[in-house]
Amino acid sequence: NDASSSKIRDLKKAAGLNVSSVSNKSLHDYGMTEERISKIENVLWSGGEPFMSSIHWELMEKLVEMGRTDVKVIYNTNFTFPEESFERAIKLLTNFKNVKILASLDGTGEDVEYLRKGMNYSDFCKNLEIFKEKLPHVKIAINFTATSMGIFTLDGVIQLCLDHNLEFEGRNAILPDRSEMSINAITPEALNDALNRSTAVASGTVLEPVIDKFVKFLRSKYMSVIFDRDLLKKNDLVFGQEEYFEKRMKGLFNV
């Protein structure tokens, strides 16, 4: 999740790759016979945008035709696909009993619109509500990737989850070598402030355990890179000690 699907498409085009040829393959091209399809138990649709993929519609509608609506389905989507695909998706997913949607959202408002090309935060929230209303059996979770910009609106993302009764899944962080987008591009004090605001919003709610776990993950990821790239190189005999690591953690993040 180091780049949005639209940016990846732009890079492919710049490199002279035929993007359309990838998305227009059929089930036959992948050797997906009815016998193989009948044995499917789980389906994971990931980015680009699955609801704009012809192979997605072909397989999912084939599963409905074959009566295999018991298949477990997981989507990773940014909820900003065209209206005709949106209506088609609602009609399709009405058939499936076990569906979970991981809605990619790396911030709120103008921040996330800057982060993800073509993202419209207002449309995202509107489409989210329509899905919840039309498909009450579908589980929806916000899939958050920590970035140097988005981390400052993590508290807003958490509030969105609470307001709309959504799950939260924050398992990702931009890799440190992508310096301008990594949380390691900001100061410990700024990161600490953003994370403290986020835990405060989640405190006493159903999201408190998962947010606490995610915050600890981000802090440990931030610290591990500091040590690996800077301090540890200077004196691995000192900075590699667990006792010192704990001390630095407490000093930077008051934990």
For the regions a protein language model found, what residue spans apply to each?
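A general structural signal for short secondary-structure junctions and capping/turn motifs
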Residues: E34-E35, E133
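Conserved C-terminal portion of the radical SAM core fold
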Residues: I74, T94-L105, Y121-N254
